[in-house]
Amino acid sequence: MHTHTIFVISDGTGITAETFGTAIMAQFDTKSRLVRIPFVDTMDKVHQAVRQINHVAESESHKPIVFTTLVNQDMLDLIESQCKGKVFDMFGTFVRPLELELGQKSLHRVGRFADISESKEYLERMEAINYTLAHDDGQTHQDLTGADVILVGVSRSGKTPTSLYLAMQFGLKVANYPLIPEDFERKQLPPALVPSRKKLFGLTIDPQRLSSIRNERRPDSKYASLVNCRYEVAEAESMMRRSGIPWLSSTTKSIEEIATTILQEVLPQHLGH
């Protein structure tokens, strides 16, 4: 398997270029090492990036691959003319053809988050993250009616990372609540969740996978035993069926896939539907 160094160069955080570049490289059977160089907003920083790329090009057997979202044309020209990597100009690939199609020049705004820190969208996103952190793992029952969605499931089924992803990526207020043995004995949802039943979405997981995850945290405990994990998962799924709660298994799905399914099922308007 070939090994390539992938550089991601941006005048902002580099998140856009990294996400896009990673998705493209996933189509190839090649092992890669990713180097993100964010906030390249001066010519000095461009020269530093070029030196870093060229050093790798001279020390490795394969030419580095460079994904860039630089907006400044002079900086981009310097990268393309002086670096010894294969450069892919992501903005140029899409923005310049769009300028022709739309009949107008792009705004050439530098950085994904330029002038966003005081915007309504940004402030709402920060509020959503704070809400989600405060309502993680059933920490509080207060203001559950303010949640956009409430995730339920057994402990370690993926509720917390999914909640934070939905908050950070979509600005959603997400509470998550663990289903525990006491709930299974009562055969009922936790009382605090009943008024918000329509906002509930369940996560389940393969018992063997759950046991493996729990053993990393509390090895050789009843909590992590396969017998207990089978019991909890079966009871949780039964409870979700009885309560009419939509749910999915997180066993083989990425957080992005889980989040998108939740949006489709519960909040389709956030997908533009």
Curated annotation (Swiss-Prot):
Leader sequence segment: none
Q: Name one GO molecular function term.
A: ADP binding
Q: Which reaction is catalysed here?
A: [pyruvate, water dikinase] + ADP = [pyruvate, water dikinase]-phosphate + AMP + H(+); [pyruvate, water dikinase]-phosphate + phosphate + H(+) = [pyruvate, water dikinase] + diphosphate
Which keywords label this protein? Kinase, Nucleotide-binding, Serine/threonine-protein kinase, Transferase
The EC code for this enzyme is 2.7.11.33, 2.7.4.28
UniProt keyword Kinase present: yes
Instruction: Describe the function of this protein.
Output: Bifunctional serine/threonine kinase and phosphorylase involved in the regulation of the phosphoenolpyruvate synthase (PEPS) by catalyzing its phosphorylation/dephosphorylation.
NCBIfam families in the record: PRK05339.1
The record's similarity note reads: Belongs to the pyruvate, phosphate/water dikinase regulatory protein family. PSRP subfamily.
Q: Report the protein name in the record.
A: Putative phosphoenolpyruvate synthase regulatory protein
Q: Organism, per UniProt?
A: Delftia acidovorans (strain DSM 14801 / SPH-1)
